[in-house]
Amino acid sequence: MDAIEQLKQDVREGRIDVERLVDLVATLQRQLQTLQQQLRVANQHIEALQKQSGDGGQPKADQPYSLRAEENRQEARKKMKKRKPKPVRRGRLTSAAKIALAVRHEEVFPEGVAKQDCQPSHVRPVWRLEQGRAVVIAYHIYRGPNSRYGKIPGALGRSEFGIEIILEIAFLVYVIGLSFDKVSALLQFFQGLQLRKAQADALLYRLARHWENEFETLCTLLAHSAVVHADETGWSLKSVWAFVSEKARVLLFGVPKDAETLQALLDPATFAGIIISDDAAVYANFSAAQKCWAHLLRKAIKLTLQAPNDPDYRAFTDRLLEIYRSACRVQRDGRLSDAGRARQVAALDDELLELCAPVWVAELPKLTDETEDNYRLLVQEVMRLMLAKELFTFVTAAPTTQPNGVSQPVAGTNNEAERTLRGVAQARDTGRTNKTLAGARRQTIVVSVLESLRLYLPCFTLSSVVAEVERWLETGRSCYQKLLAKLKLSVAERPILDRVLPKPDS
């Protein structure tokens, strides 16, 4: 039984008097008045909101498909468009504004197609460097038969910047080590080119994608070089590994320092050249090696600094340096034949044996004094490298010739690779490094291709680099690919870059 039925029964049976019933009715009436007042306030609030929204209270047309209803809908759309704010431009010029800035207009036709057989297609403004200033040139692209379009000289795809500007940015960022902010400031101050950081970043990614095949060609040339300098250093992402030869300069950014990475570029089982490196274990399996004399001499000099009053350390260091200088003189002596140099190397081995024999023959255990133990380890290292014939390889090795015609003797130190990594180490110490794998891939490609041009050009300048790269764009073949074809070599089926630096997941 609900409350209403119970109340009726109580009234019929006389359990509820009349006064109590009147009080109950009055209470319900007051509650009803309160609710009605709240409803009126809510309706007034709704009407006010509809007036503020403008069209919120607009009555809907009785005939939705009539002419009057369509006019009402169009009028409502116009009001919405008027209220929509216009997008704010961020300083980028429109194509029409760039064309208005053009210093001249040039027509570009498809190669081998006459002008009368073509028709205008579109106009592309491109920023170029002329006489040290940034100017806009409007290229009128013509379309020929079979949808063949004219190709703008010195431009990558649909980029609005010439190749000379992209190469300048790459050199300033990766070779000189400037930030994007400083590069933008330099371009604006010296050449009058306003370039945002996002634009510079996008241009470098475009250049890296365009040069991926050139990087693979350089890796193949490196694997078939006569002499390779190898060195590595720490970085924000794992390590940086530099490989410098007479045919290529390859720098790998963000790779692990292990045998698998080294095998991807220089397989010890197949590499027939000489590798010049420090005494790291990862370089232990090559058939012909030259260990860096600078590392050994620095260790010996450190002993003399730790114990300046010890005559044995001083005598050992002086004698070791004298033997190295004697080896350099034997290498430069043009009067010696191959057999004569071999005899001189045997004599140098005897001198090293005489120098190290007292400590080496004693087979001393690990010593408690750190300096004395370092001296023991250095003597053992020198003897181990001498017995492995890895100290005087440079004396009997033939000089190497670079593609630009420069001939150089094989070095007894690894200073060439260390100098290549000097700027990278400074960038690491100051925090100016890539933090992503995509950035490491980009820097690997761009730096390797740019640095390798030093071996192919007689003079490494912006004008010479631009002229060479423009020739690549015109002929479709780089100087690296020409040398690869001359040597009758082919690149690996699986890209080496994807093996050492896999593409990040998109």
Model-derived features with residue positions:
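Short, flexible loop/hinge motifs at secondary-structure junctions
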Residues: 1-160, 230, 236, 277, ...
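Catalytic center-proximal scaffold of phosphoryl-transfer enzymes
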Residues: 12-14, 18, 33, 37-40, ...
